Amino acid sequence: MATSRIYSRTAGEIIEEALRDAKIIPAEQPVQAVDYENGLDSLNNVSKFWQTKGIHLWLQERAVLPLVTGQKVYELGPDGDPCGYEDGFYSTELDAAAVATDTTLTVDSTTGMVEAPDILTSSAVTSTQDWTSVNSGVLTVSSGIVITNSGANDGGADYSLDATVGVTYRVRFTYTKGTSAGCVFSVLNSSTVEDTVTLTASASGELTITAPVDTITFRARNTSSTSGETSTVAALNYVDEDSGSRIGIELDGGTMFWSYVLDVDSATSVEMSSAITGAAAIGNQVYSFVNQIDRPLKLFNATYASSITASEIPIDKWSRQEYTQQPDKTSQGTVVNWYYDPTLGDGKLYVWQTASDVTNVLRFDVRKALSVYSATSDELDFPDEYLMALKWSIAADLGPSYGVKDNRQIVLETKAAQALESALDNDNDLGSIYLAPNWSGG
């Protein structure tokens, strides 16, 4: 029999173990939904409390922050300044000059760049099931959705797309010309057309819409009203234009323009979701990364480099008082000090001095927050060696709510404390120890 070195548990499994070991739920009795809900609350309480308890090595990652000339404060988190995890952070250079309004760039390499994924999980053109006939159009399938006029009507077809209000989407399609003179393609907010194009020859097209509601409609409609004339929707794709890699381009004016990768056209060509706002010369820096960092609980091991490929220089951590007492917070030069304030929203990183060039970067280790669990099927965000401590800690946390007797509660709390201590003993970053004489004589 094959064996594994990984022992994984779901939230529901660890909650059930805790309930049974605490003698709250008998072995022969099924766990009820309300008990799972209580267990999820306890699991989240325990995991968030544990964030105060040590290093948690598995929650540490190295991050890269491109600096902005003269900027003294950076927001770190999902809605903060562009900042990615180092293992998914890529750099390249422009291989051809770009001008304002360009959306397609030629670069040395598109390695690591991820284009916006198709939201549709299955082909929309292999069945008429999710399509709705418009104006008596007859729908069939033959190398796509075939729209046939019924009588003297310009027949059409609608396809509903789930959306998030405020998000901008690209609806892409391939049209095969039939006997109809052409076809009108549109995206609609209810009955309001937000974007439209008419094609009279086989081609691919793209429509853009910023969703004002949670359902939008793609419509294809023949331009001809002659009975029996046809058009075919051969392909349909649907993307959130801001779901690809973040991409930053150094502009000649000394700033960094940020957008999202829409398409990776080739090994050296990339299309962005928005046009650059200024000129960029051959050799200018290009950054890309997939995952914006989460709000860090802590920062440490920070280094500064004059460029992404330059040598890193360790920089010193300041206290809040040391930063606030610095009289000239806007002076530019080499960054030598930093202070981090982990606010409840995006965290705030203060640097001194401020960057003197748009190619300057900081790197630092971040400690991420533990996951919040909302379903019993969620995989636990803990290494194997923490599962025992987690089980007993959940049991101890649930005990008072279920009226566990005092002597049993003491046992649960003792087991929880001992298991957590053992787990924390294993959760440390062993390094060098330096001994030096005490020259002060104290």
Where are the predicted features?
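Glycine-enriched, solvent-exposed interface loops adjoining structured elements
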Residues: M1-V99, T104-L105, T110-P117, D240-G442
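Extracellular and organelle-lumenal recognition/adhesion modules and their flexible linkers in secreted
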Residues: P78-G80, G88-S91, D95, T104, ...
